[in-house]
Amino acid sequence: MLYHETFDVIVVGGGHAGTEAALAAARTGQRTLLLTHNIDTLGQMSCNPAIGGIGKGHLVKEVDAMGGLMAQAIDHAGIQFRTLNASKGPAVRATRAQADRALYKAYVRNVLENTPNLTLFQQAVDDVIVEHDHIRGVVTQMGLKFHAKAVVLTVGTFLGGKIHIGLENYAGGRAGDPPSIALAHRLRELPFRVDRLKTGTPPRIDANSVDFSVLEAQHGDNPTPVFSFMGKREHHPRQIPCYITHTNERTHDVIRANLDRSPMYAGIIEGIGPRYCPSIEDKVMRFADKDSHQIFIEPEGLTTTELYPNGISTSLPFDVQVQIVRSMKGFENAHIVRPGYAIEYDFFDPRDLKQTYETKYIHGLFFAGQINGTTGYEEAAAQGLMAGLNASLYSQDKEGWSPRRDQAYMGVLIDDLSTMGTKEPYRMFTSRAEYRLLLREDNADLRLTEKARELGLVDDARWARFNQKIDNMAKERQRLQETWMNPNSVGVEQLNTLLKTPMSREASGEDLLRRPEMTYELLTTLPAFAPALEDAEAAEQVEIQVKYDGYIQRQQDEIEKSLRHEHTKLPAELDYKQVKGLSNEVVLKLNAAKPETIGIASRISGITPAAISILLVHLKKHGMLKKGEAA
């Protein structure tokens, strides 16, 4: 049976990738349908109740800068906010917030239900409609057909999902939800490379059964950092602490004694787990020299007693989980509310994706989130936003867009995935970006909001706020450049108390701000440079831009050099066997990857600078180089 309405974009799955994808497509004016197996789980935090962290917070800020939802949702649901790496340079500072799961989910659903151009419908999808390598729509569990020009699959861990607790296992998409078996079988019929990954989650604990008096409390920052560029502290709910406990030798003995009952160590789980979020049994075996591991006790919300013990993700049997939990200080009488488990699921090799998240083999079909081999809410949200945007552009017969590596962590993410692929769940870190001094949390809007406005993602309120900030920054920098002091100026005594060496020659406000010991806050206490900007974000940008000017300029020069051939197109039909001088290995890799540009080709493992030079000569010889792209 065909549904009575056609759509431009269909999004399958209502997690962190799906919600951002649906909102992006709808914001750009396309009739969008979001299909989910259960409307009550839209925006659900399936694992840890937190958003952000090193690399991840950067992605959240970028999603926000492009009009996305995640940062605003956590600003309305965050019950503890912290700035990580606060004592380090601005490039690696990152925001992280604990979330009230219920508040987060409610905020997401409210936005979805009130977004123009967006229709929600509760039905699992069992099939995709493909004709002549083009997507035409989807078929739901009850045989209902929906037609659209573009389809975005954001199916999380549901494809062929299998839940493991000890040596027992059963089909499931996550605890309490059915897997997507029919769709998994259907997708395996399509010409994609598919494999298995696994992830896990710890048992949840009843706070009423924990002795907090013996635990170390960990409080958030005061004043609390704000995630969204449109956010305010007044949006934050009541703030509460987290707690810290540790595993001990007794814990480790319990784990070692029961390894034969672990599905991972018994060889039942084939999928590879996340390297940077290992299970407790993995930690004990991999770091055998450690007699203790720190465990963060994270509240799941203001109106629940459930606790999330971050650091003891496990798939060991339930009786062993009880022993592990009760071996830790403060948890001697702990009651487990939900058992921990591992989940194994299908993912598709992201090297089969274009940089727009469109699949190379089925036109109009886009993948985002864990289906691409990533882990984490933030990575999912970033992919969802870009896939939704590009599905919208595709449905309008417009050229797709994705940021470069030097423009955004979102650019690093898709470039890493589509050129190198992944064998384990991929997590974002600041260390993955070559140009991280330019890719800071604080300047995500300066990097992306203007482009997002051009693409139709940014509303008038955000655009007005952005332009006000730009204006404030420009005026303040001009003021500091034009305001001078010399050793004889009024107020120089006060200035000298702030400097390591007394002032010996005339200097502008910007000259003084470049000094390591000087901050914008200190500088504007001096009468000559008062008053400070009321716009705290603009003030922060002024300080960073002035202090790091030389380093920033150096990175921009490097980028300009590397960009010379970044976007030089490689014809899709090019047979690399016909390119004289390429080794057999290079030919095989290029024919398998079919890179869209010289830049992408250069980042494929095993493709040498010499091979790139040969390609450029070939393109020039056949008149395929544009003016200014000389080989």
From Swiss-Prot:
It is found in: Cytoplasm. Coiled coil: none annotated. Its main location: cytoplasm. FAD binds at G13, G14, G15, H16, A17, G18, V125, S180, Q370. One of its GO terms (molecular function) is flavin adenine dinucleotide binding. GO terms for cellular component: cytosol. Pfam families: GIDA, GIDA_C_1st, SAM_GIDA_C. Keywords: Cytoplasm, FAD, Flavoprotein, NAD, tRNA processing. NAD(+) binds at residues 273-287. InterPro entries: FAD/NAD-bd_sf (IPR036188), GIDA_C_N (IPR049312), MnmG (IPR004416), MnmG-rel (IPR002218), MnmG-rel_CS (IPR020595), MnmG_C (IPR026904), MnmG_C_subdom (IPR047001), MnmG_C_subdom_sf (IPR044920). The keyword NAD applies. NAD-binding protein involved in the addition of a carboxymethylaminomethyl (cmnm) group at the wobble position (U34) of certain tRNAs, forming tRNA-cmnm(5)s(2)U34. PANTHER family: GLUCOSE INHIBITED DIVISION PROTEIN A, PROTEIN MTO1 HOMOLOG, MITOCHONDRIAL. This is tRNA uridine 5-carboxymethylaminomethyl modification enzyme MnmG.
